[in-house]
């Protein structure tokens, strides 16, 4: 665990590009889990996931919408720069509304491996439980590192896969975490 960071809610007025000036969203992906029939199979790939200024602007819009619609955004701060963040939608998912959607969870490249993602995940899960959720819904990036992270936390395949998530990101693995 990295105890030098401050973990707290991010308020609407803080959501500006400047907040992410020291955030490094880059991931070199050499292996992914891909759905083949009923099984998830590890496949070699070669790609780099990195955000542009336009990607950050889109992210800000999404995070602002999350707060506006009753959700929450948590951040891990080094000084006044965010080094990790997680967001949860305020809108219930699932047939009975038992899911709360973990809409983002990212840690800056220079800060990975320090327990920041785990701490943000648990903050998000605690909030989801307090809001009446029974499960956290995760549309997991297919990169093997992301999949291993989610599995280590206890996430399992979602019992009620969300159609919109599957349509928007067909390679993502639909997971849940029981609160």
Regions inferred by a protein language model and the residue ranges of each:
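Conserved GNAT acetyl-CoA-binding A-motif
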Residues: 128-141
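DNA-contacting interfaces and partner/effector-binding or oligomerization modules
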Residues: 2-21, 25-30
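Conserved catalytic-core motifs of GNAT/GCN5-like acyltransferases
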Residues: 137, 156-173
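Acetyl-CoA-dependent GNAT
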Residues: 22-98, 103, 108, 178
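Conserved acetyl-CoA-binding loop-helix of GNAT-fold acetyltransferases
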Residues: 104-107, 113-126, 152
């Amino acid at each position: 665990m990295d105890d030098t960071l401050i973990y707290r809610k991010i308020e609407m007025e803080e959501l500006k590009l400047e907040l992410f000036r020291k955030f490094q969203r880059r991931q070199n992906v050499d292996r992914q889990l891909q759905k083949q029939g009923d099984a998830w199979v590890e496949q070699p790939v070669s790609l780099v996931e990195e955000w542009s200024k336009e990607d950050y602007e889109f992210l800000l819009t999404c995070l602002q919408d999350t707060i506006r619609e009753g959700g929450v955004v948590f951040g891990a701060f080094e000084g006044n720069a965010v080094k990790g963040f997680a967001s949860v939608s305020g809108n219930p998912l699932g047939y009975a509304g038992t899911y709360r959607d973990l809409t983002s969870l990212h840690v800056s490249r220079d800060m990975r491996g320090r327990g920041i993602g785990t701490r943000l995940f648990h903050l998000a899960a605690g909030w989801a439980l307090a809001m009446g959720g029974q499960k956290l819904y995760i549309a997991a990036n297919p990169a093997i590192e992301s999949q291993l992270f989610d599995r280590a936390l206890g996430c399992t395949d979602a019992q009620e896969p969300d159609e919109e998530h599957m349509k928007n990101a067909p390679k993502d693995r639909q997971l849940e975490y029981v609160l």
